[in-house]
Amino acid sequence: IYRGLVGSEMCIRDRYSVRDEAFVADNEIVEKNGKKYNSFGSELSWVEEESYFFRLSKWQDKLLDFYKNNPYFIVPKSRSNEVIKFVESGLKDLSVSRTTFKWGIDVPTDEKHIVYVWLDALTNYISALDYPNKNSDLYQKYWPGIHVVGKDIIRFHAIFWPAFLMAAELDPPKQIVAHGWWTNEGQKISKSLGNVIDPKELIDEYGLDSVRYLSLIHI
């Protein structure tokens, strides 16, 4: 991890999705009605600030070797191909701190910076298992584990997270299972969008087994 300064090539200068808490590559930006969005329909804002960076580029070849040696690490195959193609296109170093957030975990050596959410959030998978005590019953029983995640956060789990773990000389997860979304009129069902369908109403109308079947075939 190293510090990049404002005005240098190593500060953040990128499009950012607040809803997805993620930066977006130029080739993934969609322009509509004079505004910029990511491929999932989240509006993007421009961010330029000082940041600490994780040297993700260092782990590109190691990640590709890992995927090759573990062909079922990411399922289904379509998601695996998506991740591999993204890594092969070239990984940029990853911003792991922000200076504009009002709350969060302080960077220990620089209280001006807050740890980027996906760095501290991903570590919950092992901190909840008593890490760094790798001899604990919880850690021994559950790690490495299987992650079941939505397709919109697969890069965090299948690229960033394994790279963080490799850098810490820890085992990556056993497998990443990426599922699709339930949609409403073509949009992802989300509480933030207010387009959630009440499953109780569906069950009362069509029965539990029908709702189970409908849910599974569309995920």
Residue ranges and their predicted role:
Residues I1-G7, I12, I217-H218:
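Single conserved hydrophobic/aromatic residue that forms the stacking wall/gate
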Residues Y16-V18, K36-I217:
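Structured secondary-structure scaffolds
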Residues S8-E9, R13-V30:
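Cys/His-rich Zn2+-binding cysteine-cluster or related metal-binding knuckle/ribbon modules and their
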